Amino acid sequence: MNCSLRCRFFLILVMAGFSFFVALFGMRLMHKMAEFAYFEREHVVALSKVYYELHKKEINISFIVGQVQRARRQTTAVNSLWKGDKALLRLLGKGLILELSEASEIKLGLLERYASSIYKDGLNPGHIEEMKRLVSWPYTNSNRFGIEIADISKRVKAYVYFLVVSINCLFFVVIFLLMKKTRSSIDEIVHVMNDMSRGDLTYRTIPSNDEVGKMQSSIIAMGAGVSALIESIKHIQGDLFNSAGEALNISQSTSNDICDQAGKIDEFVSALSQISFAITETSNAANKSSALSSEGRQLAVHGQKAIETAVSSINALSQRVNDSHVAIKCIEADIAKIGKIIEIIDQITDQTNLLALNAAIEAAHAGEAGKGFAVVADEVRSLAQRTNNSTYEIQAMIASLNKGIFFALGVMGDCVVESKNSVNAASEASRSIEKIVDSVSQVMLQIAQVATASEEQSAVVKDMLDNANIIREIAAGVELGSRRISEVNTHR
């Protein structure tokens, strides 16, 4: 039992694995025996049906073949055992099962092939006798096989139970002994630690070679080291008392210097407080300026948007005026065409008057016969005169309309020029506002930089104040320590 903890745990694991393997193998073998018993019942039933079928007057060959195949399942299951299982059966004195199974497999194979080769029309008494002879041996020995199966099942179950119980008992005994050995070593370590806690560093023991023994050796070495350390501390204590006097003088001098530095630190803290207040005021003013600049920038942006809207409206109006100018030009062209048509009508009227005059002259020459023609000529001349008067009126109206169109074109041209001037002025104003917005943005950026710098300076000053306060507290602590050292050395 004088082995390491690792060896003990490995031994426990090996025994547990072996116990599990034995139990698993036994359960498998018992399952095989139960399977063989089931196939044996199938075997007996199938052979009985074959035997009774052969004694009938009308024999069904396909039924016999099916039952023989059913009976062969038992022999096939036995013959498919592992070599280890077969060796175990022979070791237990049950090799007869394997021999009976092999012989029955041969007989049933011959019977199946023989029955499959017989056709119904060719069946004769000789075939029946041959099949009876082939089935008689498996049928006769099936009882022996069943007895052997039942016996081996009982024997395997008993052996498995015995092995499992024995191995588990041995397993628990080994665990108990290992725990007892390990616990005694741990109790010894606890005893050594208790003695060391009471100041006894002289305990000695003979450690073992396992992990617990190594722990004991380490604890003993630690006790020796602690003992040597205590002796060294005793020697150092004397040197400390000698150095204490020198430390007293140094501490008194340091205390005086610290008192002087404390006054200067107070003045420095006061100056830093004033600087911090001024930086805070600057930061607040920068923030207010940033807010005002932001409002001014927003107003400028709104004004720029309004100007852009006005420019868009003026451009739309200018486009409409241009469209009207084009439409009036088209009207002017149409009026010119009308004037040409009126000129043609004047020419036609003049020709008509001339023709009417010639007709009247010819009617006068004709006398009475030309009176009716003279009346028509007068009417034609009258119509030509009215047409001529109408053309004069139309020409007067066209002249008046041309004057109005000329005036409208002039006004529209002025409107276009004015709208372009307005657009240019608005664009110039928009560019100016855009420059203002850019300038305000730069101002806001500079103000933000000023505010950021002020905040950073404020943070730096705050850190300096904190550090100064810490230095002051340290100085006060050092002064207090110097006084205590002086008091300790005075009482010593």
From Swiss-Prot:
One of its GO terms (biological process) is signal transduction. GO terms for molecular function: transmembrane signaling receptor activity. It comes from the Bacteria. The chain crosses the membrane at residues 9-29, 159-179. Pathway: Hydrocarbon metabolism; alkane degradation. Residues 180-231 form the HAMP domain. Its main location: membrane. One of its GO terms (cellular component) is membrane. It is found in: Membrane. Gene3D superfamilies: Methyl-accepting chemotaxis protein. It is a multi-pass membrane protein. Keywords: Membrane, Plasmid, Transducer, Transmembrane, Transmembrane helix. It holds the Pfam family MCPsignal. Residues 236-472 form the Methyl-accepting transducer domain. Chemotactic-signal transducers respond to changes in the concentration of attractants and repellents in the environment, transduce a signal from the outside to the inside of the cell, and facilitate sensory adaptation through the variation of the level of methylation. Belongs to the methyl-accepting chemotaxis (MCP) protein family. This is Putative methyl-accepting chemotaxis AlkN. It comes from Ectopseudomonas oleovorans (Pseudomonas oleovorans). The gene is alkN.
